[in-house]
Amino acid sequence: MTEQKITFADQKRKTVEIAEFTEDGRYKRKVRSFVLRTGRLSEFQRNMMNNNWATLGLEYQTTAFDFTQIYGNTNPVILEIGFGMGKSLVEMALQNPDKNYLGIEVHTPGVGACIAYAVEKQVKNLRVICHDATEILQDCIADNSLAGLQLFFPDPWHKTKHHKRRIVQPHFVEKIQQKLVPNGFVHMATDWENYAEYMLEVLTSAVGLHNTSATNDYIPRPDFRPLTKFEQRGHKLGHGVWDLFFIKNIT
């Protein structure tokens, strides 16, 4: 019996770099690896990652990305954190060829599926990263370089004792605000009302951001945000969906 070759995609599946924090939730510059127990990476997804990473994938680095070099233009860059299987991200890239999209996802089946769909649709204005988002924001994204941040249906960690694990925290939003250009946007969506209320509280408290909602809370689902499988799941479960759209002030 021949031993199966460990490919690039297999290595991505087994380890991913994550950030660590102090007891009060502040980021500290220390990196460790851990075994990521994800869903099965199909042979098709594995091949898509192995064969297309050079053109669609980016690796973590300790210096800021040069977006002009990466995309070959100076179009605005929109970052999406946690794109799942990537269908809506690819669709947004297709609908907006005058914008560049950068997606972060730690689960390799989703990364493989996103790359496959991007290849199928011949998308050129999209790059993906399989790495912890906090590390990428800290080291790879220059201040005042992003036109927008999208965070759609992140894990709600609905148990109270797990709320500290939610990605939306004051220090996270503070970091996002630093990375946005003036008039850059933060667009979040969730199908958990408690998480929506918490997102609203954190975003409203952030210095340098203002809410675009006419009622100073949530906005109707915008036409430019494609329906995701998580949103469809929420509808089936009778959940509402809450969109938040904040803009960075011009100072």
Swiss-Prot record:
Pathway info: tRNA modification; N(7)-methylguanine-tRNA biosynthesis
Q: Which UniProt keywords apply?
A: Methyltransferase, S-adenosyl-L-methionine, Transferase, tRNA processing
Q: Which SUPFAM superfamilies match?
A: S-adenosyl-L-methionine-dependent methyltransferases
Catalysis performed (reactions)? guanosine(46) in tRNA + S-adenosyl-L-methionine = N(7)-methylguanosine(46) in tRNA + S-adenosyl-L-homocysteine
Give binding positions for substrate: K159, D191, T228, K229, F230, E231
Name the active site residues: D155
User: What GO cellular-component annotations does this UniProt entry give?
Assistant: tRNA methyltransferase complex
Q: Does the keyword Ribonucleoprotein apply?
A: no
The cross-references to Pfam families, in alphabetical order and at most eight, read: Methyltransf_4
The Enzyme Commission number assigned here is: 2.1.1.33
Q: Which Gene3D superfamilies match?
A: Vaccinia Virus protein VP39
The residues listed in the UniProt record as binding S-adenosyl-L-methionine, with positions renumbered to this chain, are E80, E105, D132, D155
Kindly list the GO molecular function terms attached to this UniProt entry.
tRNA (guanine(46)-N7)-methyltransferase activity
| Stored PANTHER family | 3-DEOXY-D-MANNO-OCTULOSONIC-ACID TRANSFERASE/TRNA GUANINE-N 7 - -METHYLTRANSFERASE (PTHR23417), PENTACOTRIPEPTIDE-REPEAT REGION OF PRORP DOMAIN-CONTAINING PROTEIN (PTHR23417:SF14)
- What family name appears in the similarity comment? Belongs to the class I-like SAM-binding methyltransferase superfamily. TrmB family.
Q: What does this protein do?
A: Catalyzes the formation of N(7)-methylguanine at position 46 (m7G46) in tRNA.
Protein name (database record): tRNA (guanine-N(7)-)-methyltransferase
Q: What is the name of the gene encoding this protein? A: trmB
